[in-house]
């Protein structure tokens, strides 16, 4: 492909640019410019084809010679248009291939750069020293776990008690509390009640209720007599 690019952009075998072709970015840009130019040419030819077709229809049987000339020009334009379509396809394929190659080149460059950086980072590392460091870390972690376990164990500091004696004392306290509660329930203190006021309650509400009941009975008797 480098030979093709050299011929395309004027780098001859013995010329000044021999051995140094254009950059991928420059070649891609020129291919895009060529595509744009050919696309404009396509639009121009399509308009010319429409114009010649309209002229052929206009003349028709009235001016057969003019109609035939218009159709011939239309055919030439169509042939040029087909050639441009093929050229555009070729240029598009070449541009995409060049873009992919350029992308791959950039990717490889970046990967090589990262590999060098990783190598530089590992230059001061020794696998034996790393193993020793990890072993020291494991030992220190084990020691820390042992210290934590020792600290968390309860220490009596000489205070030893009989569990049975403590349970017996606890039962006595519970029984005393129970007896106290029973005494409070069975023997409450007598609280003097206040004197009831000796006020006569009026009997009007009861009398009114009796009158209402008498009225209801009268209405019921009147209803029964009408039946």
Curated annotation (Swiss-Prot):
Compartment(s): Cytoplasm, Cytosol; Late endosome membrane; Midbody
Domain of life: Eukaryota
InterPro entries, alphabetized: Snf7_fam (IPR005024)
Membrane topology designation: Peripheral membrane protein
Coiled-coil regions listed: 25-185
Keywords assigned: Coiled coil, Cytoplasm, Endosome, Membrane, Protein transport, Transport
GO cellular component assignments: cytoplasmic side of plasma membrane; cytosol; ESCRT III complex; late endosome membrane; midbody; multivesicular body; nuclear envelope
Keyword flag Transport: yes
Region annotation (Disordered) ranges: 1-26, 186-227
One record GO biological process: protein transport
Compositionally biased intervals (Gly residues): 9-20
PANTHER family (UniProt xref): CHARGED MULTIVESICULAR BODY PROTEIN, CHARGED MULTIVESICULAR BODY PROTEIN 4B
Described purpose of this protein according to its UniProt entry: Probable core component of the endosomal sorting required for transport complex III (ESCRT-III) which is involved in multivesicular bodies (MVBs) formation and sorting of endosomal cargo proteins into MVBs. MVBs contain intraluminal vesicles (ILVs) that are generated by invagination and scission from the limiting membrane of the endosome and mostly are delivered to lysosomes enabling degradation of membrane proteins, such as stimulated growth factor receptors, lysosomal enzymes and lipids.
Protein family according to the UniProt entry: Belongs to the SNF7 family.
Complex formation: Probable core component of the endosomal sorting required for transport complex III (ESCRT-III). ESCRT-III components are thought to multimerize to form a flat lattice on the perimeter membrane of the endosome.
Record-given protein name: Charged multivesicular body protein 4b
Species annotation: Gallus gallus
Lineage, uppermost ranks: Eukaryota, Metazoa, Chordata, Craniata, Vertebrata
Protein encoded by which gene: CHMP4B
């Amino acid at each position: 492909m480098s030979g093709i690019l050299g011929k395309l952009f004027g780098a001859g075998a013995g010329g000044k640019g021999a051995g140094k072709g254009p950059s991928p970015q420059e070649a891609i840009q020129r291919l895009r410019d060529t595509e744009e130019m050919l696309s404009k040419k396509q639009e121009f030819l399509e308009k010319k084809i429409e114009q010649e077709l309209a002229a052929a229809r206009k003349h028709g049987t009235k001016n057969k010679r003019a109609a035939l000339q218009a159709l011939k020009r239309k055919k030439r334009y169509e042939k040029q248009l087909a050639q441009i379509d093929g050229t555009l396809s070729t240029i598009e394929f070449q541009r995409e291939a060049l873009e992919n190659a350029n992308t791959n080149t950039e990717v490889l460059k970046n990967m090589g750069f990262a590999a060098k950086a990783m190598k530089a980072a590992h230059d001061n590392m020794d696998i034996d020293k790393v193993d020793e460091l990890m072993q020291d870390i494991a030992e220190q972690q084990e020691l820390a776990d042992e210290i934590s376990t020792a600290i968390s164990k309860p220490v009596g500091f000489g205070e030893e008690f009989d569990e049975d004696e403590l349970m017996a004392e606890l039962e006595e306290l519970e029984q005393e509390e129970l007896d106290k509660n029973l005494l409070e329930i069975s023997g409450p203190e007598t609280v003097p009640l206040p004197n009831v006021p000796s006020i006569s309650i009026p009997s009007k509400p009861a009398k009114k209720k009796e009158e209402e009941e008498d009225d209801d009975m009268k209405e019921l008797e009147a209803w029964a007599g009408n039946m």
